[in-house]
């Protein structure tokens, strides 16, 4: 299951983790929150969009936190060791690729990718952005980070397969 893989990946990494997700995928965000609670890490929300989405989802009981101290503000990161942090990057309009690019070249508002960081991509980039994603992955490696993609068998594209399309046509 996806949640188990996320928790295991986070538990196994000794340094700082940057999780790239789509802001509107609340089930994936919940899995990150659960993994953080299970592994004793705090979650930093780096974007205005994701912060608003998360706060609203918590208020509407669509997301839950194991405890209120699970979420910290970006300015509080310096109070924690790298192994205590998960940085949740969703980028503007819920797309994390540009935020990761900025992190890899030191232009992000709060985070710069450094040696020992794991960039864990738990979303499937749209087909139109695959080339951009490949370039960003290279930039992350050049900055000293390590990239891990969620297991292919666990990813969901949001698009129908050939059988689904055939069913719709007939």
Q: For the regions a protein language model found, what residue spans apply to each?
A:
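Acidic/His-rich, metal-assisted hydrolase cores and their charged scaffolds
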Residues: 1-170
């Amino acid at each position: 299951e996806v949640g188990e893989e996320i928790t295991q990946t986070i538990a196994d990494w000794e340094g700082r983790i940057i999780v790239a997700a789509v802001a509107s995928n609340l089930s994936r965000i919940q899995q990150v929150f659960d993994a953080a609670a299970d592994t004793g890490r705090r979650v930093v929300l780096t974007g205005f969009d994701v912060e608003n989405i998360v706060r609203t989802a918590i208020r509407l009981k669509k997301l839950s936190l194991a405890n209120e101290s699970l979420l910290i503000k970006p300015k509080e990161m310096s109070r924690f060791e790298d192994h205590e942090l998960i940085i949740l990057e969703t980028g503007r309009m819920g797309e994390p690729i540009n935020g990761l690019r900025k992190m890899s070249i030191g232009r992000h508002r709060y985070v710069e990718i450094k040696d020992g960081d794991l960039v864990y991509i738990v979303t499937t980039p749209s087909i139109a952005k695959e080339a951009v994603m490949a370039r960003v992955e290279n930039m992350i490696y050049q900055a000293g980070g390590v990239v891990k993609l969620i297991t292919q068998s666990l990813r969901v594209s949001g698009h129908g397969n050939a059988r689904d399309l055939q069913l719709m046509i007939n």
